Every structure is written in structure tokens, then in C-alpha cells.
From Swiss-Prot:
This is Cholesterol side-chain cleavage enzyme, mitochondrial. Its cofactor is heme. Residues 27-47 are annotated as: Disordered. Its EC number is 1.14.15.6. It comes from Ovis aries.
């Protein structure tokens, strides 16, 4: 993370030109007022070849990128390039060429050209594994009509408001159990508080949550003895993400040819993910077939099977993708949120006050409480602004379009640099400050096409509503029970492991409210 308290320009790479120049805003470009149309111009567009670029030799570019150890700092690489080239640039790394944009108005214009079947960039090692080993695919990889067919079904069972209501009684007890786990740790340490890095606990919390929503059953990941098979799944997801980065810029054909250790580890991780997900799905599938009545919501798997709108193979593929996507992503966002709260105690107290007021007004009804915590929900947006799960959002426009006065041909990969956007003072005042209130202002132009942590539109993250609910419930219970502090004051930097992760352990202090939570 960029150093809080330092001027923004001084926190960036020293070799970069100053961020702010006289009479200019943002990374080397005039700030376009919201509504003026950053992507639309009456001028004759300039050709694609004139878009600023480090050069057209992708392999030389990749060599220099690797020399600078760019793979794990690609989010800073984007910032440096926007400083150097302005609000739009193109870059070819290996065989992959992309156009990068940063201005929210340009983003809004881009999405108008995504078509009926929006396409994102497929992560090469993931796609290579599925193709080489003939694994079934869900909405993560499907295209066109096949994608839309599955997505419409999942929207009903996973994204719709009525479906989300069913998830509350499944997710709320998991958050309560996490609080109990921390209280148990406090008692074990015997110092009246718990100090530690809870990353692994958050992984288990996230897996317990997503499996409960999928299958309507608990796995016991927060108990004293953790199921070793479930832990293998969590470890495999972690390894799958971490082994992806070294393989991103290499032709997939080389993976099988050279059989490097990284590729072998990547394959082994995916094998474990598929094997465990298949096992869980089959166990709960057989269990559900034997039941005719359910006291509680039986989970997404049951409803997908009951609807008969998907083939069983497609159900399994989508369940596998949601399980794999629901561990590191949610847990990492929660870790960053706790980190930011611990560094901004005044914000933490504001959030706690809101939660306690909501508890009192809702008379303990958690469903009503969820409608009364706008600042808490804004704090999740703010965490994703500072620490987005993905550093870019990608689209292949369906037809030619003009961005920043340049003609972009149809099917060109255009990447929205959401990490860089979130750190640009042209788009966010005081961008290094953790300030959830920025999302609650009445001026909608200030947040127009800036909240992109879960993607956008019909191709946004299919697990978005689950993740938002899961994180909100978790934070409600943490704020009611603990004051969260940093063990040591200092910045934690980020590294790119396909998702943004801390470069070192984050040690937090959890101080319980021994007499119950403070009064609102």
C-alpha cells in the first residue's frame, strides 16, 4: 500500500515524473469534468497506431517487464505508465496486446460497446488447464449463448434479492462462530486480548460461508479440529492463484512442452479443486435426493438441481467455480478492511456507532439491521477502492469505438486500470485516506463509474451479492464485539498474486468489550 501521510507523488516510484503538473490533474492529463464525455469527441479520431506505447515488440517489452520484477507489481506498473503516457496507452507483453484506460467517463463509454455477451480476458493458465484436461466450464469461461443461458439461471438463484434473503440465516451463524473463535483465542492467550495474523482463519471462515450457502450444510471449518480434506481445498485455491502469475505472459503451448514446476503445481492445485468440489457436490447431491422436506433453505445446489434448467455437468462446473472464487477473494478483502479500520480508529468508531444504532432500532432483527448500515456498506466499497481484488477490469468491445480521441478496433482487449483509478487524486480527493463517507455524498457524479470492485453490468462477479452479505455480517459482529488495532504502526505494501495480497503478515489486536458492546 502507498504510504499514508506522504504526498501522493512521493509515495510512487522515484523515477516517475511528478504526478501533478501545473495546470494539469491526474496522471499527465487534463481532468475531464464529469458529464463532458471523456470517451466521446467531435474531432476526427486518431489511428490506433498512434496510441502512446512503449513499443510494438512484445518480447522486448516482456523482457524489460520481468527485469523490473513487474509481475508482482503490475498495479504500480500501470500507475507508472499512466504518468508517462497519459490517460490512455497500449502495451504489448509477449503475445498479449491491451489498451489501458483510467478515466471513469471513458469506462462508461466502453461499456456501451460491450454487446449482449460481454467478454472478459480469460486467464491463460486457467483456460489451458481446462482445455488440456477437458474439464467442464461454467460462466467463468463460457461465451455467447452458452454463457447467457447459465448466467440467467444463476442470476435467479444467486443474485436476486429474494435469493439473498435466504442466505442470511446461513451466513450469520458463521460470523457469530468466528467471534466465538476469537474469544477462545483471547482466553488462550490470557492477556485480555488476542494478537495475531488471522489470514488463515479468514480463509476458513470464507470457505465455511460459501459451502454453507452452496450446500446448506456446515463443514466445521471454525471448530478446534478442522477437516483435513477441506483444508486441502483451501490450500489448493491459494496455490492456484499464486502459481498463475508466473504463467500469465507465456504461450500456453509452452506449459505442456517444458512441464515446469510452476505449471505442475498449478495443475495439481486445479486437480485438487476439481476433485474436492466434485466430492462435496456428489455427497450433498445424494443427500438432497433423499430428502423431500426442508426446515431451512437447503442451499444453491438444491435449487439449481430442482429447477432443471441446467445439465448436472453444468451445475457441477458452476458450483466448482463459485467455491474456488469464494475463498481468497472474500477473505483478502476482509483482511484489508480490518487493516484499514485498525489504522483509522475514528472511522472504526463511526462504523461501530452505526452498527449499534441499527441493532437497537431493529430490535436485534439482523435482516432489518442490514438495511440500516449504509456507512458500513460504503466502507466495503472503500476497501475495494484501495485494495481491489483484480487490478483491471477487461472488455472486448463488440464494434469500433473512440476513446480519448483514438479509434479502438472491435475485439481489441481494453483494460480498465481500477487500482490506478482508485489512487488518482483526479478521481478521488485525498485518495490514500480510508474514507467511506466519500460514497455517501449526494453528488452522484463524484462516484460515477468508480465503484468497480466487483466488475460491472451483466458480466459482473456472479458471487457479488453473497460476498457483500458475507462481509457485512462479519463486520457487524466484529464491530459489536471487538476494538481492532494494529500491533505495530506502519504501512503494509501490496503484491500482485492475481489478486492483491499483503507483502507481509498483518498482525492485529482484538480487544473485547468485556461487559458487552458499548451502548449506542
Amino acid at each position: 500500500m502507498l504510504a499514508r501521510g506522504l504526498p501522493f507523488r512521493s509515495a510512487l516510484v522515484k523515477a516517475c515524473p511528478p504526478l501533478l503538473n501545473t495546470g494539469r490533474e491526474g496522471w499527465g492529463h487534463h481532468r475531464v469534468g464529469t458529464g463532458e464525455g471523456a470517451g466521446i469527441s467531435t474531432r476526427t479520431p486518431r489511428p490506433y497506431s498512434e496510441i502512446p506505447s512503449p513499443g510494438d515488440n512484445g518480447w522486448i517489452n516482456l523482457y524489460h517487464f520481468w527485469r523490473k520484477k513487474g509481475s508482482q507489481r503490475i498495479h504500480f506498473h500501470h500507475i507508472e505508465n499512466f504518468q508517462k503516457y497519459g490517460p490512455i496507452y497500449r502495451e504489448k507483453l509477449g503475445n498479449l496486446e491491451s489498451v489501458y484506460i483510467i478515466h471513469p467517463e471513458g469506462v462508461a463509454h466502453l461499456f456501451k460497446f460491450e454487446g449482449s455477451y460481454p467478454q472478459r480476458y480469460d486467464i491463460p493458465p486457467w483456460l489451458a488447464y481446462h482445455r488440456y484436461y477437458q474439464k467442464p466450464i461454467g460462466v467463468l469461461f463460457k461465451k455467447s449463448g452458452a454463457w447467457k443461458k447459465d448466467r440467467v439461471v444463476l442470476n435467479t438463484e444467486v443474485m436476486a434479492p429474494e435469493a439473498i434473503k435466504n442466505f442470511i440465516p446461513l451466513l450469520n451463524p458463521v460470523s457469530q462462530d468466528f467471534v466465538s473463535l476469537l474469544h477462545k483465542r483471547i482466553k488462550q492467550q490470557g492477556s485480555g486480548k488476542f494478537v495475531g495474523d488471522i489470514k488463515e482463519d479468514l480463509f476458513r471462515f470464507a470457505f465455511e460461508s460459501i459451502t454453507n450457502v452452496m450446500f446448506g450444510e456446515r463443514l466445521g471449518m471454525l471448530e478446534d479440529t478442522v477437516d483435513t480434506e477441506a483444508q486441502k481445498f483451501i490450500d489448493a485455491v491459494y496455490k492456484m492463484f499464486h502459481t498463475s502469475v508466473p504463467l500469465l505472459n507465456l504461450p500456453p503451448e509452452l506449459y505442456r512442452l517444458f512441464r515446469t514446476k510452476t505449471w505442475r503445481d498449478h495443475v495439481a492445485a486445479w486437480d485438487t479443486i476439481f476433485n474436492k468440489a466434485e466430492k462435496y457436490t456428489e455427497i450433498f447431491y445424494q443427500d438432497l435426493r433423499q430428502k423431500t422436506e426442508f426446515r431451512n433453505y437447503p442451499g444453491i445446489l438444491y435449487h439449481l438441481l430442482k429447477s432443471e434448467k441446467m445439465l448436472l455437468e453444468d451445475v457441477k462446473a458452476n458450483i466448482t467455480e463459485m467455491l474456488a472464487g469464494g475463498v481468497d477473494t472474500t477473505s483478502m478483502t476482509l483482511q484489508w478492511h480490518l487493516y484499514e479500520m485498525a489504522r483509522s480508529l475514528n472511522v472504526q468508531e463511526m462504523l461501530r456507532k452505526e452498527v449499534l444504532n441499527a441493532r437497537r432500532q431493529a430490535e436485534g432483527d439482523i435482516s432489518k439491521m442490514l438495511q440500516m448500515v449504509p456507512l458500513l456498506k460504503a466502507s466495503i466499497k472503500e476497501t475495494l477502492r484501495l485494495h481491489p481484488i483484480s487490478v483491471t477490469l477487461q472488455r472486448y468491445p463488440e464494434s469500433d469505438l473512440v476513446l480519448q480521441d483514438y479509434l479502438i478496433p472491435a475485439k481489441t482487449l481494453v483494460q480498465v486500470a481500477i487500482y490506478a483509478m482508485g489512487r488518482d487524486p483526479a478521481f478521488f480527493s485525498n485518495p490514500d485516506k480510508f474514507d467511506p463517507t466519500r460514497w455517501l455524498g449526494k453528488d452522484k457524479d463524484l462516484i460515477h463509474f468508480r465503484n468497480l470492485g466487483f466488475g460491472w453490468g451483466v458480466r459482473q462477479c456472479v458471487g457479488r451479492r453473497i460476498a457483500e452479505l458475507e462481509m457485512t455480517l462479519f463486520l457487524i459482529h466484529i464491530l459489536e464485539n471487538f476494538r481492532v488495532e494494529m500491533q505495530q504502526i506502519g504501512d503494509v505494501n501490496t503484491i500482485f498474486n492475481l489478486i492483491l495480497t499483503p507483502d507481509k503478515p498483518i498482525f492485529l489486536v482484538f480487544r473485547p468489550f468485556n461487559q458487552g458492546p458499548p451502548q449506542a
